[in-house]
Amino acid sequence: MIKTGSIFREWLPGWAIKAGLIFCILPAMLLLGLYNSNSTYTASYLGIEPEDMQFTMSLTYGTLIATMLIEQRFARFFAARNYLIGINLLTIVVLFASAFVKNMTMFVVLRMIDGFIMALPGGVMIQLLFTRFPSKFGRVIVYSFFYCVLLCSPAIINFLVGFTLDQWDWRYMIYGAIGVQIIGLAIIILLFNNKRLERKLPLYQVDFAGYIILVALLVAGTYVLVYGEKRYWLNAWDIRLGITIFIIFSGLFITRQKTSKRPLFNLDILKSANLRSGLLLFIILYIGRATLNVCHATMVQVWHWEQLYLAKIQWINAAGSATGVIIAATLLIRKFPVKYIFAASFGIMAIYLYWFRFLFKLEVGIGEIALPYYLQGLSVGLIFTPLIMFILAQAPSHLAIFGSRAGASTRFWATSLGFCLIHNAQVFLQRSHYISLSRNITATNPLAEERLSTLTATFISKGYSSGAAGQLAYKQLDASIRTQSFLLGNMEIFTWLAIVFIIFMILILLNKHLQQTYNLFRNRVFGY
């Protein structure tokens, strides 16, 4: 049990402690999306491909997940004040180094260190926030705030990044983040005294070998999911090696956890069928959430919206997420049946997917995409807190911490899996539609001939020779076919996913055990 009465300076009012804790937890949550917020710019700055940016982001997230399994030991070893000061100082050093790195290898190393550092303060800060909201609804309030900020962070970061790049250089974005960390450092020094949270535990009991094995299998698995399609899967030696490492190290990790006295992850938590159902819902949710990248790619590649304009538009989605989180918290407090919250979320996601299907065309205005774009955020915000609490409900009290770790690990794999599935579906469908449409570009097709003649005449009128004009006409027509193939592929993806979400919505409504499980958790935590 955390003893919080003595770790804060006694002369500080309660509201100041709450405000300080909230401010100190925000930077770690926002930094997760700092480099990925403008992946195109960062990729060009480092001379790498967008897939490389996705890989580095996944590495950061994977290292964060692995570190979550051991961060409690670090928090028990150090006094809270020294622990948080050390984390802030390390973050400042890594951020400063990141501002001057142009080498991909060093960038990857720094991103993995980022993931390690960002995982350390989370558990302590959330537990401290729980103690500042002692009511029976305190957990709902804290979780709702935490996930609201997490879901809205892409919009916040994108807006700040867009403004920074419009006014200054990319490095100023890093300098701004360093400034926030310095302010957080000052607040920590002001809030905490040198007393400890709990009894000190030695670090030699930490399973560092298991941690290294876990990081290795996460890196290998992420590499396969991100680069598999680009490297033609099993035709590439590095993909085969990645799969081999993943299988071997997964076996080693499972064996070690089953035989260890102090496992990083207790596999008994997965015996609950309801917990596995909750994790499955997370996977489906994140696959649907990955479609947001398809929307953003269309905005940039087809509609040619500028980065700053796109950053402003993302506030619509963030508003939906915030609204969903607030509605979910209100419904939980009012004892609303949780399975209907899940069903409503999946139903709203299906509406967004099917609606957006009709928006994949060459010209679209903000007024047309605003409502479905808002609904996507509303769907995700509505389900996040209830689903987390539902997963926690499956764990016995002595395994509760492993319930949260299972949820976090599933979100990591669901993020990578969602990227992999959507990306591969896009490539396959775009290629299929391109081949199909290209077959119509023949000398016997009057529409194709008319289009080519018009384009050729246009280029000739601009001063090109007939030969050059013909080549440019073919290139422009080919670009048009590729754009249409891209849009048609997106339409198919969104249609099929809408059907999947409708099916899961029906299955949720027919399930009789979801509400019973949540009632058990509600009685345990809220006492009613």
Protein language model regions, located:
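Transmembrane-helix exit segments and adjacent C-terminal regions of multi-pass membrane proteins
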Residues: 2-10, 464-528
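Central cavity-lining transmembrane alpha-helices of secondary-active solute carriers
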Residues: 57-73, 122-127, 315-328
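Helix-loop-helix hairpins in multi-pass membrane proteins, especially solute transporters
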Residues: 70-209
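MFS-fold secondary transporters
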Residues: 94-99, 114, 188, 355-363, ...
